[in-house]
């Protein structure tokens, strides 16, 4: 058995999101097909169709967009039949050259939040773990920065936590990433390779993490879409760690922050602090306020 870490990123375009977040969801390979089957069944029962048939997907930026929260609460909860019919009317409106009516918007909003809730519940069901590296948006590199071909400090901490998890379970791990802009992906792959092959810490972690990531398109992979949901929710609504002071979307925080806390990897580890051993909590979601290395 091995563990697959499905990864995505949020905020690296430096536009509307408050932080830069990279990370994802780890799940045992033996549970992968089971959770995918459950996702497909849930999608059809909640929306009444496959979203891919209408060229859309359940990424976090879509399921949890502000408008869908607004639509969902504008009327009482719908029963399953009414919701599915409303969703279909909503999705086919542009094909039929008509405007959706109020109840169609309500149905689509309620279905979106119900799907997000269901996906998080499935992560609990299959004992998935969340790992994420958070850093300030738009941090500038120091002048004459020498380590652009190596991982940033926040990404090193992400690898450290995934490696600890794998070592604890005595299993190896694969990274499967959402394919984005080609040059951006090539750079991150090069940084990973240098980290795992040229640094002592990376070489040690390569005993557990396969150093070569795989890139796939999110619109054809359910698990990368779930990773996107988790990373988006962390960026917009997770403020549990010291230093996370940027504006928060309260509707996401109130609905999912405790869920994200519970799903993140956690380990009690012994570290040498000021010359003495001390037990510390290691969490899968980690904020780094200064991500650029000063030395290798």
Predicted regions: what they are:
Residues 1-296:
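Phosphate-ester processing/binding pockets and catalytic centers
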């Amino acid at each position: 058995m091995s563990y697959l870490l499905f990864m995505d990123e949020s905020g690296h375009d430096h536009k509307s999101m408050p932080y830069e977040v990279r990370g994802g969801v780890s799940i045992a390979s033996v549970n992968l097909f089971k959770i995918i089957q459950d996702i497909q069944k849930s999608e059809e029962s909640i929306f009444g169709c496959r979203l891919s048939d209408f060229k859309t997907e359940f990424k976090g930026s879509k399921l949890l967009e502000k408008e869908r929260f607004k639509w969902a609460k504008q009327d009482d909860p719908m029963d399953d039949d009414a919701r599915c019919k409303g969703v279909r009317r909503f999705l086919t409106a542009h094909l039929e050259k008509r405007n959706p009516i109020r109840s169609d918007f309500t149905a689509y909003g309620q279905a979106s939040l119900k799907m997000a809730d269901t996906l998080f519940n499935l992560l609990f069901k299959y004992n998935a773990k969340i790992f994420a590296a958070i850093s300030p948006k738009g941090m500038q590199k120091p002048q004459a920065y020498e380590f652009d071909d190596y991982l940033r400090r926040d990404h090193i901490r992400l690898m450290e936590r995934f490696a600890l998890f794998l070592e604890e379970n005595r299993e190896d791990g694969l990274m499967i990433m959402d394919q984005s802009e080609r040059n951006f992906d090539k750079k991150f792959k090069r940084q990973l390779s240098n980290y795992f092959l040229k640094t002592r810490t990376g070489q040690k972690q390569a005993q557990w993490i396969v150093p070569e990531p795989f890139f796939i398109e999110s619109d054809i992979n359910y698990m990368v879409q779930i990773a996107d949901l988790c990373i988006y929710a962390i960026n917009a609504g997770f403020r549990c760690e010291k230093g996370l002071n940027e504006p928060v979307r309260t509707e996401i925080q109130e609905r999912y922050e405790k869920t994200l806390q519970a799903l993140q990897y956690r380990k009690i580890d012994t570290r040498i602090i000021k010359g003495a051993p001390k037990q510390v909590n290691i969490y899968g979601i980690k904020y780094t306020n200064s991500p650029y290395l000063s030395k290798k």
